[in-house]
Every structure is written in structure tokens, then in C-alpha cells.
Amino acid sequence: MARNLPATVLSDGTILLEVNNPEYESARDAIMRFADLVKSPEYIHTYRLSVLSLWNAASCGFTSEQVIEELSSYSRYPLPENIIVHIKDTMDKFGITKLTYEDGNLILICSDPFIMEEIRRSDRMEPHIERPAGKDSLIIKAYSRGLVKQILIKMGYPCEDLAGYTEGDPLDMSLASITREGLPFSLRPYQKDARDAFWAGGSVRGGSGVIVLPCGAGKTVVGMGVMELVGAQTLILTTNVVALRQWINELLDKSNLTEDMVKEYSGDKKEVGPVTVTTYQILAYRKRGTSKEIFPHFDLFNKRNWGLIIYDEVHLLPAPVFRITADLQARRRLGLTATLVREDGREDDVFSLIGPKKFDKPWKELEAQNWIAAAHCHEIRVDFPQDKRLEYHVAGERDKYRIAATNPEKYPLVKAIIERHPEDQILVLGQYIDQLEHIAALLDAPMIYGQTPNSTREELYEKFREGEIRVLVVSKVANFAVDLPDASVAIQVSGTFGSRQEEAQRLGRILRPKPQGESATFYTLVTRNTKDQEFSQKRQLFLTEQGYKYTIWESQDFLNQWKRRNQR
């Protein structure tokens, strides 16, 4: 007999979760730790037990028995027998292969003799094997540590790396108890938990992996806490120059590090010190006309004896940096991100080269504890003007989205929303520059996009923080690692197709906790029954998984409600 529980687990690994069930929220919080959200229409959300989601759960300490027990406790029907077997087989593969370091040799150990034979005979593994070390072990070439882990995860045997790390040159760093502005400072409880999960008491079981925390939850501070524990010279990789300088400001504000110890390596400066902060862009730069293999700034990885490398917004790590990271497996590596989702599907490379997920905290849990602002999400659907419909329907697939996303009917809505929030600091976010230029002119508001000089960006961000600017129009350059704590309203007029990570990052711009505990409001404007609406639903997946709900409005209903409110 069926029980009144929210989940139905199918034999193909699909989990159907009923939203209106009283136990939906607790089931969602449990399931999201070991399954991926696939789609989220109004009443039934669909999850899937993926191999990588189960391996990440295993790396966080979950056992197959715990996952089966959690699923069973929320499942309306008994779990299919093949799913029980799948969970056990998948999770039990984590740790079958291990890398260790013994007597000056890198050793690959495999606890299953048949899998070991498969590895021995693999054409991909053969170039990396020095010689056999025993029935269950191989000596691996020293430079192949990262490549071997990449190969093994593709073969279906994620490798637990216990080979240890180069300590790096020492760094005398400690976190401050009072900031430079005289404010008290300490790590929050969950920040300590994240730091300690990564460090694992300094053992070989720690020292590499990814910390997943919402935007606004202080991932930079977690990174600084790890730096203090490691106590070694550190290279920090960030998304852009603005983020780079925010890292430097935070380090100088909240630690004993001085300006001569923290250096910027960017297009403007090429300085290297005990702590050096750079960008993915500068590392992936190569001169036109040179070999695709030549990246002149890769030598930064050898300029110092780094004991720790921090990858900020690790979900954005570009392919060339993956390549150099494969050679850096003897260095401790910390990835920081709000979401492990990568639109290029290379989550397994993050797992094998940076490390598995070490800590994850649901967004709604931190919201309930007032560490991040509560947020209300709205999707407002607008119609096409008649003169745009033919252009849309005869366009190619890519142009269809651009035409729908830049629908001019969105402009009066943007203005109406801003009038609705007269006291708030507001970000207008979009993908298409001509659309943003029109909105900036309409609102008489400043705009930041890719061509805006870094000095101008920083000046405008600072004026926004100080309240001199109330509305700021920004392109995707502001998606990541921009600290605008007073921003409380975001209006998204267009996005990068169906990018789930972008939606999460854009909401994150307004999640910094507010002085009086005020909530944040996120609007996304979409053209009804078009690619714009279709991609919007894909973008919302990650946030839906985190517990956010979108109120759906018809544009005229939204405007009428606002008019009625003004007439009262």
C-alpha cells in the first residue's frame, strides 16, 4: 500500500518529488545531497541519481546505506531493487583506487584484482605506468598524478588521492579579531565547519576539494581561514580584476598580512609575493599567432613554492587552467563556488583535479539562520509586439532567443519595478549590450560592461556601495565575485541562454545580509511562449533545488496591481 510520502523512485534512477506534500521541504533537503535536479514544473520536481552526485556524496562521508535509508524514508513505494544495487555499486567504487606516496614513489593501489587488471591493460593508462609494485599496486610516473585521476574517473573508478602534498614555503598569517575599521571579526560556525572539512586535521585525507556555499555567505573568508591553517605561501585565482582587488582588500582588512606580502598579478601589474592574486583571464592569455600550447603566464605557478592554490568560482575554471592544474597535484588545492554546475559538463574534471566536494550548505538553511538575506523571486511574462512576431518565427534558433530576450515590451516593466522600489539599491542585469544601453539611457543610469575600464568599474561600484548611485545597469561582467552588500533588488532582462550557474550568481548579487534584516527581490523578465521562457525555466533549476520559488506574473497583472497599490 502506498504511503503519503513525497518521493517516488523509479527504476531508471529518476526521483519524482511532490511539491505539495507536507514533507516536501525535508525530503528536498535530503535528496539534493546525493541527486541532481533535472526539471521543476509547478507540482512535481524531477531528480536523477547520477554517478557523480553519488560520488560527491561519498566524498562528503555519506555511505550507500545512509543514502538508501534517506530515500526509503521519503519514498511512497519500496525502492526498486536495481536502484539499491546501483547506489551501492556506485558509491562503493569511491576509494577502490587510491594514490599514495611511499619510498619516493607515487603508488596506485586497487583493492579489486579484476579492476586492477583492467587498469594495467588500459591503453590510456599505459604511458603513465612506471612498473608494477605488487599484485594490487603500480608505480605511477611522478608527473602523471593528475592525468591518472582524470583517466580513472572516466573509467568509472574515482581515485582517492592520499599521496600528500608539498608543504610550500611558510606564511606567517593569522586572522584578525578586529578589522581595520575597528569592527569585530571571527569565522561564522558554518565557515569554521567548511574550513575544517577541507583541512581534515592536516591529514592526507584533506587538502584538496571544493567548498560549496551561497553567494553572500563569505566564501572568501573561508578561503582565508584555510590559508591560516595551511600556513604556506598562497596563489589565488579569481574571475576578474575587480574580484582580485576585493580579495586583496579582504586579506588586508581581516588578517595580519601587510601590503608588501599581498601582490596583484594582472594586466596592470605583474607583481609576485608570498600571497599573489591573479585572474583566470591573465593565465589563459596567449599572443595571437603563437602556438595554442604557449601560455606565457603559466610560469606564475612556478614563481614561488606555493603551499596552497585557491580557485575562486571554480565552476568557471577555463580549459587551459585545468591543463596546468593536472601538473599541480602536489600542491594543496581549494575550490570555492556557489554551484558545482558547469555548463560545459566538466564537473568530473573539477572532481578529479581540484578535488571532491568537501562541504555543502543549503541556501535556505543559511537564510533561516539570517546569514544571507531572504529572497523573493518573480518571473514576469510579457507579450511580443505584433511587429516582432514574424521576425521571431522565421529566425534561426540562436537568433530566436536574442529577439525574444530583447523584447522592447520589457522596458516599461523595468521602469515600473524601479518605481515600485524607491528606497532600494537596484541592479539591472542583462546579456545584450544594445538592450542594456537602451535601458541605461531610459533610466539615466550608469552602465558597466566588458569594455568599461577597471578603474571606472571600481569607481561606479564604490558609488553604488555609498548610495550615490541607486540604480546600476550591468552586463554579465558583474555576475561573479562583485561585493555589493546593499543591493537588494535585481532585475534580469536577459541571460546566457539556459545557464543555471548564472541565475544562481545573479541572485547572489543581492543576498548579502541587510542591516535591518530586509529581504531581497529578484525579478526575471521573459517573453511568453518563446525560447526566452524556455531558457528561463532551465536557468531556474538550481535555485529551485535550493528551495526558492518563483511567483509567475502576467505583465499586465503585475502593472495593474502596482497601479491599484498607488491609488490606495
Labelled PLM ranges:
Residues M1-L175:
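Extended alpha-helical interface modules used as scaffolds for assembling large macromolecular complexes
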Residues S203-V226:
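Walker A/P-loop
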Residues V242-D268:
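Conserved helix-turn-beta segment of the N-terminal RecA-like "Helicase ATP-binding" lobe
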Residues V262-E264, L427, D434-H438, D444-N479:
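Conserved helicase ATPase core of P-loop NTP-dependent helicases/translocases
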Residues L308, H315-H378, L543:
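Post-DEXD/H (motif II) to motif III coupling segment of the RecA-like Helicase ATP-binding lobe
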Residues L340, F497-S519:
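Conserved SF2 helicase motif VI
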Residues V394-Q431, E437-H438:
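Conserved interdomain hinge at the start of the Helicase C-terminal
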Residues R509-R539:
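Conserved segment of the helicase C-terminal RecA-like domain
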